[in-house]
């Protein structure tokens, strides 16, 4: 028994050393556009949502593409909020800025039922390629609650990641969502009959 005691202590020491070197978890959030605001405020209200996100990326951890059919779940690099909430939040802030819309809500918050236009978004791809690109492939529908007319579109955006690391990858996703938001804003303007 005394011969096994040093082995037990060595195993315990190795375990404690492993526990002491646990990597800290980092949290990331996407940001809205920094583009100039619309020149004239919108006279209509908007509701954004629901937003559908692929199940493979619908998790707290950032999911990165490591090959054509392979992903890595980054255990210590996480979204600060679920993507199903982050994407509509960023799109709402972008549309508010781009269209001058002050009356804009995220579905199903109060006020969203009375919106002039309802926007639903289906994120078909939300891919993260660290050091390379952020890819957002989105399809949307804008529906007028006044006359039930609809407009739709699709954007396939590949935004270059400017440097290594997760902060740059998340910034690239923010820029990709800015481009998607710009195309959604164009659809809303076309339906509202206003000029860009």
Residue ranges and their predicted role:
Residues 20-84, 191-196:
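A structural "domain/chain start" motif
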Residues 15-18:
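C-terminal motif of bacterial Sec signal peptides marking the signal peptidase cleavage site
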Residues 20-37, 42, 98-146, 161:
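Surface-exposed short loop/turn segments
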């Amino acid at each position: 028994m005394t011969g096994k005691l040093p082995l037990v202590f060595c195993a315990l020491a190795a375990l404690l050393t492993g526990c002491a070197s646990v990597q800290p978890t980092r949290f990331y959030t996407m940001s809205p556009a920094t583009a100039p605001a619309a020149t004239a405020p919108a006279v209509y209200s908007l509701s954004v949502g629901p937003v559908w996100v692929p199940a493979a990326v619908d998790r707290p951890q950032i999911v990165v593409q490591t090959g054509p059919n392979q992903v890595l779940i980054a255990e210590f690099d996480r979204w600060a909020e679920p993507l199903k909430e982050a994407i509509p939040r960023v799109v709402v802030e972008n549309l508010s800025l781009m269209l001058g819309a002050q009356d804009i809500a995220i579905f199903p918050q109060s006020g969203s039922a009375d919106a002039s236009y309802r926007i639903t978004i289906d994120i078909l791809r939300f891919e993260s390629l660290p050091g390379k690109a952020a890819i957002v492939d989105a399809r949307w529908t804008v529906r007028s609650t006044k006359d039930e007319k609809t407009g739709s579109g699709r954007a396939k955006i590949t935004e270059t990641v400017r440097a290594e690391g997760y902060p740059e990858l998340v910034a690239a996703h923010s820029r990709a969502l800015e481009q998607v938001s710009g195309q959604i804003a164009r659809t809303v303007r076309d339906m509202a009959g206003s000029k860009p």
